């Protein structure tokens, strides 16, 4: 049994979120939640919410036992960029791209 959860258009770059995702891949969910709780990175908070959602989905929809669940797969894909304008000197302007990503977590036993 495998259960998915995803967060689309998360306001963090995929590269930064992948650093946190690599920490919990293949671990059991209790250990993964503990790692994320003590990680100082912004991505840890976002991934923790998605992982908790996947655990709740498994418990509610399939009646799964939380103690037996593991993080089967976790991957972070690049999302659409938000294009913004930043004023510069002498009437010029630069484009600022604010990166987003899609976080996908699959838990199972």
Curated annotation (Swiss-Prot):
Coiled coil: none annotated. The lineage of its organism: Bacteria, Pseudomonadati, Pseudomonadota, Betaproteobacteria, Neisseriales. Pfam families: Ribosomal_L22. It comes from Neisseria meningitidis serogroup B (strain ATCC BAA-335 / MC58). GO terms for molecular function: rRNA binding; structural constituent of ribosome. This is Large ribosomal subunit protein uL22. PANTHER family: CHLOROPLAST 50S RIBOSOMAL PROTEIN L22-RELATED, LARGE RIBOSOMAL SUBUNIT PROTEIN UL22M. GO terms for cellular component: cytosolic large ribosomal subunit. PROSITE patterns: RIBOSOMAL_L22 (PS00464). Present in outer membrane vesicle formulations which are used as vaccines in human.
């Amino acid at each position: 049994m495998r259960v998915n959860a995803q967060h689309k258009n998360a306001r963090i770059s995929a590269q930064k979120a992948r650093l946190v995702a690599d920490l919990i891949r293949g671990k059991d969910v209790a250990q993964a939640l503990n790692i994320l709780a003590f990680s100082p990175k912004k991505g840890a908070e976002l991934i923790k919410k998605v992982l908790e959602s996947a655990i709740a989905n498994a418990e509610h929809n399939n009646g799964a036992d939380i103690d037996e669940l593991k993080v089967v797969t976790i991957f972070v894909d690049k999302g659409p960029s938000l294009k913004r304008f930043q004023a510069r000197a002498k009437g010029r302007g630069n484009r600022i791209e604010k990166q987003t990503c899609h976080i996908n977590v699959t838990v199972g036993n």
